[in-house]
């Protein structure tokens, strides 16, 4: 009877809801940075090159610190890792708000600090902690809830940001983001790793180094890491540069915000479907289909005439595929190596 339960402990319930809130806030804020470019360009004289470099540095730090926060989460608990990361995230937004934001300071605030914060608050660490609370039969479904409910941040944040930037300016918008991140920091306290009595499967006896050695000797894991490079490239390209791209093609700024919101809205359904299918069929086939369809969506968007209709179709189709890779990918990692070092091993995948 116990094995048929979806939730195996009270901690699992609290952790799932808290992780959803953490991801909603963390990725919701991150999703909107592309909308700030015009304001930063006019007010701070941030060039397209400087902005792009900061986002690139941010992504690099996000990836590099993911395995570190994953190892911290595996050893000391998810809440320790995520709270630590939120401190960096809040600091980055705070210094963007207060300044100075010229030259190297902009790179430190937008790139270094926020990037480190994302390494522990974005999807990989909260999801890996949730995965530790669920058995193989329901793990990908539980993980898909984190992705799907977190997507409300993707959906709501661009709408708020577009309105706030027009009505109140970038300073006020960043101030609100700071408050939201503090709320996320509080929620992070409740993202707890299961105790020994709450574990749904026995931990392996492997050491940290043995787990890493086995992972990189496993062909499937190496291919998974390589494939996720493409996933990260897609997401960063679209989230950062599509807002300016549609404006350059003659569309209005509200269309850019609408694309990001549609991505968030349709990602809810795509993530849930991916999680459900990953529990029923081959995760490899699901991932292959997602990557193929992403390519089709991008080609359609580039080669069709610029219009609101084509932009909305792209937002909806790409949104359906946006983070639908995550439940299948994390499910494969957990299936191959168990959950003891899931934070570390999935963090390495996310690094790519």
Predicted regions mapped to residue ranges:
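C-terminal transmembrane helical hairpin of 12-TM major facilitator-type secondary transporters
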Residues: 263-267, 278-332
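Hydrophobic core of transmembrane alpha-helices in multi-pass small-molecule transporters
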Residues: 104-121, 229, 310-324
């Amino acid at each position: 009877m116990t094995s048929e339960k979806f939730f195996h402990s009270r901690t699992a319930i609290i952790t799932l809801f808290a992780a959803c809130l953490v991801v909603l806030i963390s990725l919701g804020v991150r999703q909107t940075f592309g909308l700030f470019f015009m304001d930063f360009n006019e007010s701070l004289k941030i060039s397209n090159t400087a902005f792009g470099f900061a986002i690139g540095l941010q992504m690099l730090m996000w990836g590099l610190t993911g395995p570190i926060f994953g190892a911290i989460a595996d050893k000391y608990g998810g809440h320790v890792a995520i709270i630590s990361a939120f401190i960096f995230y809040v600091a980055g937004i705070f210094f963007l708000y207060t300044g100075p934001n010229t030259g190297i300071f902009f790179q430190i605030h937008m790139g270094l600090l926020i990037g480190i914060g994302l390494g522990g608050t974005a999807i990989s660490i909260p999801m890996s902690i949730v995965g530790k609370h669920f058995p193989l039969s329901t793990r990908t479904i539980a993980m898909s809830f984190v992705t799907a409910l977190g997507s409300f941040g993707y959906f709501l944040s661009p709408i708020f940001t577009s309105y706030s930037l027009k009505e109140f300016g970038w300073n006020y918008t960043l101030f609100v983001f700071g408050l939201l991140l503090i709320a996320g920091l509080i929620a992070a306290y409740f993202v707890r790793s299961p105790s020994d009595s709450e574990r749904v499967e026995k931990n392996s006896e492997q050491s940290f180094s043995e787990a890493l050695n086995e992972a990189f000797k496993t062909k499937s894991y190496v291919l998974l890491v390589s494939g996720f490079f493409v996933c990260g490239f897609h997401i960063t390209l679209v989230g950062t540069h599509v807002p300016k791209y549609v404006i350059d093609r003659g569309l209005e700024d509200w269309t850019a915000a609408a694309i990001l919101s549609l991505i968030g809205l349709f990602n809810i359904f795509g993530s849930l479907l991916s999680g459900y299918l990953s529990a029923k069929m081959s995760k490899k086939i699901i991932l292959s289909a997602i990557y193929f369809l992403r390519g089709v969506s991008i080609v359609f968007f580039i080669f069709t005439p610029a219009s609101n209709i084509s932009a909305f179709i792209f937002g909806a189709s790409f949104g359906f595929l946006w983070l639908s890779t995550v439940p299948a990918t994390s499910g494969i990692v957990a299936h191959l190596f168990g959950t003891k070092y899931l934070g570390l091993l999935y963090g390495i995948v996310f690094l790519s």
